Swiss-Prot record:
Tagged with keyword Nucleotidyltransferase: yes
Organism encoding this protein: Triticum aestivum
Broad class of the protein's primary localization: plastid
Catalysed reaction equations from the record: alpha-D-glucose 1-phosphate + ATP + H(+) = ADP-alpha-D-glucose + diphosphate
Protein name as it appears in the record: Glucose-1-phosphate adenylyltransferase small subunit, chloroplastic/amyloplastic
SUPFAM superfamilies with a match to the protein in the record: Nucleotide-diphospho-sugar transferases, Trimeric LpxA-like enzymes
UniProt subunit comment: Heterotetramer.
Start and end residues of each stretch annotated as Disordered: 1-36
Location relative to the cell: Plastid, Chloroplast; Plastid, Amyloplast
Length: 473
């Protein structure tokens, strides 16, 4: 089990890191690297909580997108926060706007008021959207979300701002990202994914020169426009064979921006721009600023839709190596310490699945599924290709007895129920002999009053929903 964050210390980087070397092994002469390159006291992390999450609805009905549960024990926000902490970045702000109560609660419980770092001054602090005489509107995009709190970010004595999204699944060493920014004397550095032609049409692409400097942008190009965006990805570090397979680079929506550049862009040059990706970054390129690409050639998933979220979760059960592993001790993923008992599995057949803490599983079959915290699965149930998010609390035996007397249904999965290719949100009450198998192969349906939606053929049962015994979906 990963060590709870509260019990783990985050040492300051070794003084030996203060003297950086470039690829050739010589001391860097970069104007940035001449300054203190200690990321722990020179970089401020800013995680953007995102919009209303309409494509992830109904999972975002009662929570912000970064607060959506992930991988049985975690939440999406744990990914960028953990990446920061593992990269020795311990001063972190999280910008929120929609349904932020559960996100705020999770962050305060998981990361506390002091998380170590440089001079023991680390923090993870939530900044909610607010209205003021100067800003009567809620924030309108990624750049506007930063601009509204620029007065606060400016107070920090840092060299760069690290702008991150709160709904991506990946593991990245931001120290290398930031060092590349400094060694290239960049004003802005954009994290980039190598792409093949099939995937490239769904992303915003970038074109670079022979020094890795971004010179052109194109949003979801096709045909001849797509071919015009081909680049030599060996410039960014791919070998010849892989560069041939991946001749495009797409923006990950992750940026390192020098402090003085950020202030200049958002206040002076583009005071009305709302979005980094479509307005501020291309604008900076057009005005002659040095905007560099930094290649990230690892697993990355934008958890923007129900289908992407479902696939990312089920991907952690993949054999022999999952798409994303929560078992990497060199870069662990931290979360809220809940002090739950071990899961109890009684006469159950469980294969190719991940089981969270505190579950009670009785005489049932579970295959290729992720079972979340405090899940209760009754006798005879069959769970296949499914994500169960679990529950926020246990019901006592007295509660269950009282429910039974009133004809109610306890939290969890009832006896002899069959669930396949579904997402069951927290605290759902699934009765006995319920079939959630999409019998009619429906691809899209909104049945909110009945407690479920279907998107991309995946049935999603709403948080706190009740499906009576005998229900068939």
């Amino acid at each position: 089990m990963d060590v709870p964050l509260a019990s783990k210390t985050f040492p300051s980087p070794s003084p030996s890191k203060r003297e950086q070397c470039n690829i050739d092994g010589h001391k860097s002469s970069s104007k940035h690297a001449d300054l203190n390159p200690h990321v722990d006291d020179s970089v401020l992390g800013i995680i953007l909580g995102g919009g209303a999450g309409t494509r992830l609805y109904p999972l975002t009905k009662k929570r912000a997108k970064p607060a959506v549960p992930l991988g049985a024990n975690y939440r999406l926000i744990d990914i960028p926060v953990s990446n920061c902490l593992n990269s020795n970045i311990s001063k972190i702000y999280v910008r929120t706007q929609f349904n932020s109560a559960s996100l705020n609660r999770h962050l305060s419980r998981a990361y506390g008021s002091n998380i170590g770092g440089y001079k023991n001054e680390g923090f993870v602090e939530v900044l909610a959207a607010q209205q003021s005489p100067d800003n009567p509107d809620w924030f309108q995009g990624t750049a506007d979300a930063v601009r509204q709190y620029l007065w606060l970010f400016e107070e920090h004595n840092v060299m760069e701002y690290l702008i991150l999204a709160g709904d991506h699944l990946y593991r990245m060493d931001y120290e290398k990202f930031i060092q590349a920014h400094r060694e290239t004397d960049a004003d802005i550095t954009v994290a980039a994914l190598p792409m093949d032609e099939e995937r490239a049409t769904a992303f915003g692409l970038m074109k670079i020169d022979e020094e890795g400097r971004i010179i052109e942008f194109a949003e979801k190009p096709k045909g001849e426009q797509l071919k015009a965006m081909m680049v030599d990805t060996t410039i960014l570090g791919l070998d010849d064979a892989r560069a041939k397979e991946m001749p495009y680079i797409a923006s990950m929506g992750i940026y390192v921006i020098s402090k003085h550049v950020m202030l200049q862009l958002l206040r002076e040059q583009f005071p009305g721009a709302n979005d980094f990706g479509s307005e501020v970054i291309p604008g900076a390129t057009s005005t002659g600023m040095r905007v560099q690409a930094y290649l990230y050639d690892g697993y990355w998933e934008d958890i923007g839709t129900i289908e992407a979220f479902y696939n990312a979760n089920l991907g952690i059960t993949k054999k022999p190596i999952p798409d994303f592993s929560f078992y990497d001790r060199s870069a662990p993923i931290y979360t809220q310490p809940r002090h739950l008992p071990p899961s109890k599995v009684l006469d159950a057949d469980v294969t190719d699945s991940v089981i969270g803490e505190g579950c009670v599983i009785k005489n049932c079959k579970i295959h290729h599924s992720v079972v979340g915290l405090r899940s209760c699965i009754s006798e005879g149930a069959i769970i296949e290709d499914t994500l169960l998010m679990g529950a926020d609390y246990y019901e006592t035996e007295a509660d269950k007895k009282l429910l039974a007397e009133k004809g109610g249904i306890p939290i969890g999965i009832g006896k002899n129920s069959h669930i396949k290719r579904a997402i069951i949100d927290k605290n759902a009450r699934i009765g006995d002999n319920v079939m959630i198998i999409n019998v009619d192969n429906v691809q899209e349906a909104a049945r909110e009053t009945d407690g479920y939606f279907i998107k991309s053929g995946i049935v999603t049962v709403i948080k706190d929903a009740l499906l009576p015994s005998g229900t068939v979906i």
